[in-house]
């Protein structure tokens, strides 16, 4: 990806206390009202979750992507990205989030098992075998609990807890989107952008464009 690709593109989606989103080539010189967020270089990038080493603390640079329904592999956009702002969380809020993460993990495992037994489930439904369906459901629930226990209960690391309760971030995005960098200087600029006035579609009222320079060390 050449740095010129991004020059003149906009931060086209800005949500206060959440993130700023850019990298859509269609945003160059785009008039207000134009639908943005679907453009790219014509390819996606495989998901690369290095979690919990890299997580969504304030300033994290992450890849945007399409939703799970149409992108189950969670592949990243070839160009679109977002910079996290988020908020500071209380410890009890993070504990509640851990419980939600555990439930989400179990639901994901259960859904995978259901998919693996889809033919058997279809046969049982065709034959209206309610007892068989109930027996299979009980079996899948038991397998779900076993697999979830083997994986382990999702918990935030001490580093995450410290970051989310001091500088802030968006912990609910962890392990969902690829984090590939962070802002080392200029968080004050990110703050100004995330505070800018936006229109109904979350696009800034006054365009916020970017230029990019690749620095090799």
Protein language model annotation of sequence segments:
Residues 1-217:
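Cyclophilin-like peptidyl-prolyl cis-trans isomerases
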């Amino acid at each position: 990806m050449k740095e010129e690709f991004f020059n003149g593109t906009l931060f086209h989606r800005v949500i206060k206390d959440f993130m700023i989103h850019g990298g859509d080539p269609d945003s160059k010189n785009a008039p207000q009202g134009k639908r943005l967020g679907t453009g790219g270089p014509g390819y996606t990038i495989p998901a690369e979750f290095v979690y919990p080493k890299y997580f969504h603390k304030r300033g994290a640079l992450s890849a945007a992507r399409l939703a799970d329904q149409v992108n189950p592999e969670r592949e990243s956009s070839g160009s679109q990205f977002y910079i996290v702002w988020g908020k500071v969380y209380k410890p009890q809020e993070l504990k509640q989030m851990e419980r939600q993460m555990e439930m989400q993990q179990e639901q994901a495992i259960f859904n995978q098992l259901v998919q693996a037994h889809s033919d058997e489930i279809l046969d049982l439904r065709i034959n209206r075998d309610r007892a068989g369906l109930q027996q299979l459901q009980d079996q899948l629930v038991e397998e779900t609990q076993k697999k979830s226990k083997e994986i382990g209960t999702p918990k935030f690391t001490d580093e995450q807890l410290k970051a989310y309760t001091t500088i802030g971030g968006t912990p609910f995005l962890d392990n969902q989107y690829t984090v590939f960098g962070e802002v080392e200087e200029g968080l004050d600029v990110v703050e100004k952008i995330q505070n800018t006035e936006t229109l109904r579609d979350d696009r800034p009222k006054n365009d916020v464009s970017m230029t990019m320079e690749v620095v090799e060390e």
